[in-house]
A protein has these predicted regions:
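An N-terminal hydrophobic leader/cap segment in hydrolases
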Residues: 2, 14, 18-46, 50-60, ...
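Short beta-strand/loop motif that positions the catalytic acidic residue
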Residues: 247, 253-255, 259
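Catalytic nucleophile-loop/oxyanion-hole region of alpha/beta-hydrolase
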Residues: 75-78, 104-134
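The serine-hydrolase catalytic nucleophile loop
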Residues: 74-86
Length: 339
């Protein structure tokens, strides 16, 4: 007996639901706790036993006067911090960085770990690094996605003395718009395995040809991520947007005016809600792109960071303070916080 139209609709709906369920975005969060987290032989070993490559650039001439923990961006890995770390080392600052889950040489490369798992790793690594350097000023630095995750970790009580936010990924769903957000959700649930491109490399993330060449040749760069990895990134940016108004530490927030990946509109939306503090700065670089620390003027940015660590109330040496480069954004800063 042929099926009625109603039965066909019900079966089609059920089949569609099964297909969507079977193709949900892949998330590989941290597993059960099996040990105490530790830094061992160039690795960060998490509480669930996951082992992630870890790097350190030691301060020149002995004990550091400050320590920076770097959190890399989407598709990147620990070596994102190599160039600025050399400048900071010469200034007496030690830098640490690791490959986050899903990136670099991590065992789950190409799979999203979940915002809370990634933020949890930041909290754990920060505790371990802080324990290595008791009494030394300690800063959490994040680039792009790393900046978003740094905001989330700070909101969850990361034990640091300040935040350094570089080209922070703040393109939350409310700034992407319903079409882009809906399209991403559709593809992430229907074909989560689909590799997407072009990646940030093809959107000219820097004006530095040497950096571009290194990115193209480096096998550790994730060039064609799955669409569900991008869906996870948006989740992280949503969480960062929610966390941004609650920053309770000094912070240095830097963006390039030539950034094609994180345009000014999402930045404007976030800074209007962020606390305006005398020990914090907004900086905008006229010739800056997305990878500020690896641009042609990367050393200028790295030295601004050193200057801020030394004196948080003084203007940045480069003149990048928003009051000089983008006074309208300086005026917007903290303007929508209310009472």
């Amino acid at each position: 007996m042929p099926l009625s139209n109603n039965y066909r609709r019900i079966l089609a709906a059920l089949l569609g639901a099964v297909m969507l369920a079977s193709c949900a975005p892949t998330v590989i969060p941290a597993g059960e706790t099996v040990r105490a987290p530790a830094l061992e032989d160039g690795r960060y070993v998490a509480a669930d036993g996951t082992s992630l490559p870890f790097a350190v650039w030691l301060a020149a001439n002995g004990a550091p006067r400050a320590v920076i923990l770097g959190v890399h961006g989407f598709g990147d890995y620990r070596n994102a911090w190599e160039e600025p770390a050399e400048i900071w080392a010469a200034a007496g600052i030690t830098t640490y960085a690791w490959d986050q889950r899903g990136f670099g040489a991590s065992p789950t490369r190409g799979r999203w770990a979940g915002t809370q798992t990634l933020a949890g790793d930041i909290l754990a690594v920060a505790r371990l690094v802080r324990a290595r350097h008791p009494g030394v000023p300690f800063y959490l630095a994040g680039e792009s996605m790393g900046g978003a995750l740094a905001l989330v970790a700070a909101d969850q009580g990361a034990d640091v003395d300040g935040l350094i936010l570089l080209a922070t990924a703040l393109r939350s769903r409310d700034t992407l718009g319903p079409v882009a957000t809906g399209g991403l959700a559709f593809f992430a649930h229907v074909v989560p395995w689909l590799p997407v491109g072009p990646t940030s490399i093809d959107f000219q993330p820097t004006d530095n040809p040497r950096t571009m060449e290194k990115l193209r040749k480096d096998p550790m760069i994730l060039r064609y991520p799955r669409v569900d990895l991008g869906y996870g990134l948006v989740e992280a940016m949503d969480a960062a947007k929610e966390a941004a108004p609650h920053i309770a530490k000094p912070y240095l927030m830097l963006h390039g005016l030539g950034d094609r990946l994180i345009p000014q509109d999402p930045v404007r939306s976030a800074i209007a809600l962020m606390p305006r503090r005398p020990d914090s700065h907004l900086g905008f670089y006229r010739d800056g792109y997305h990878m500020l620390l690896r641009d042609k003027e990367g050393p200028v940015v790295a030295k601004d960071i050193v200057a801020w660590i030394d004196d948080k109330r003084a203007p940045l040496p480069s003149g990048a303070d928003a009051e000089r480069t983008r006074p309208e954004l300086a005026e917007l800063w903290g303007s929508k916080r209310g009472g």
